[in-house]
């Protein structure tokens, strides 16, 4: 029997043929009940359409248009503040964040004697950036090798896709990556992660069924043996109300610590921006269970309102590590408070 975490042997029938520019799939996860390594070669980078800020503005256009449309008048009056308050609440900012922003905006307008809607618009951008600033935190993997990122989230939030995009971003920082297919119950999840591994040219540790904690444990040891910089561990999607599944997440975190007593070095929850205030409830639940160190907010691509970021800042300021604005492989970037505020208000 081969050792766990080592590449599986394949016979002629199980090997895939090489095609031009493609990598060889050393072993297919569904052929073995043991953890296997899927090795892929990194393909050439594809050009990214448009600047990141432009894509972010397009993604937040719905809320941005509502907000900027309020500043077309000629005076700053009580009606303008009331309209701003309604627009922020409609954008999923929530009552706490909205009240904080409006109070700060009123105080700033008085102090700086702002008398034009354009001046108030600029002040709103500055106050929004200040509110979101605690969510912005530099992401660095120095000090740990491998640096282990545990990723959780509800079904359909874009977790596996975000992992694939994150791997690409990390490669752009000259870091090597290994993916752990910790969702062992859904074959589609493993196949999706393997596809991202092939697309990025990174190895994937996978297993058909079995204990997800064991797969991630093996992945950490495989990464250490290979000298890999970062391990990203996928986990099965679950609702915070599924208490037994939340307990499983806690177990996975404990097992990761057995592989490396300093790990996981990051524990992230992936959120769908389209879920609005429900995303805030997810943050609270996953944070209470796991002690989150970061968030990934996905699907800011034109239908989401984006105000939930302000709600998170006001009520549960877990750092927002990355945001995603589309389906492209480069459509995931580190969160920048000032940039996000400009995209909403400019």
Regions found by a protein language model. Name each.
Residues 1-138, 144-150, 168, 172, ...:
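Non-catalytic terminal/linker segments enriched in charged/polar, low-complexity residues
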């Amino acid at each position: 029997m081969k050792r766990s975490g080592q590449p599986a042997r394949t016979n002629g029938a199980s090997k895939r043929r090489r095609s031009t520019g493609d990598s060889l799939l050393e072993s297919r996860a569904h052929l073995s009940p043991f953890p296997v390594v899927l090795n892929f070669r990194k393909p050439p980078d594809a050009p990214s359409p448009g600047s990141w800020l432009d894509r972010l503005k397009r993604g937040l256009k719905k809320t941005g248009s509502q907000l900027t449309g309020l500043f077309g008048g000629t005076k700053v009056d009580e009606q303008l503040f009331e309209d701003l308050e309604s627009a922020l609440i409609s954008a999923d900012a929530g009552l706490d964040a909205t009240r904080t922003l409006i109070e700060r905006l009123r105080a700033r307008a008085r102090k700086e004697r702002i008398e034009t809607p354009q001046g108030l618009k600029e002040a709103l951008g500055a106050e929004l950036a200040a509110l979101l600033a605690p969510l912005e935190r530099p992401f660095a993997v120095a000090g740990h090798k491998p640096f282990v990122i545990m990723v959780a989230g509800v079904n359909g939030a874009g977790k596996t896709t975000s992992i694939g995009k994150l791997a690409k971003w990390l490669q752009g920082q000259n870091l090597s990556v290994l993916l752990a297919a910790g969702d062992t119950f859904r074959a589609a999840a493993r196949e999706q992660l393997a596809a991202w591994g092939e697309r990025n040219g990174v190895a994937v540790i996978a297993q058909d069924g079995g204990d997800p904690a064991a797969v991630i444990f093996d992945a950490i040891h495989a990464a250490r043996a290979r000298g890999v910089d970062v391990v990203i561990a996928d986990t099965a999607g679950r609702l915070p109300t599924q208490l037994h599944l939340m307990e499983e997440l806690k177990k996975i975190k404990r097992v990761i610590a057995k592989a490396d007593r300093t790990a996981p070095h990051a524990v992230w929850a992936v959120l769908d921006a389209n879920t609005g205030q429900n995303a805030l409830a997810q943050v609270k639940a996953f944070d209470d269970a796991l002690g989150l160190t970061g968030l990934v907010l996905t699907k800011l691509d034109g239908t989401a309102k984006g105000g939930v970021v302000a709600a998170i800042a006001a009520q549960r300021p877990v750092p927002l590590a990355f945001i995603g604005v589309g389906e492209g492989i480069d459509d995931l970037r580190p969160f920048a408070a000032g940039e996000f505020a400009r995209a909403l208000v400019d």
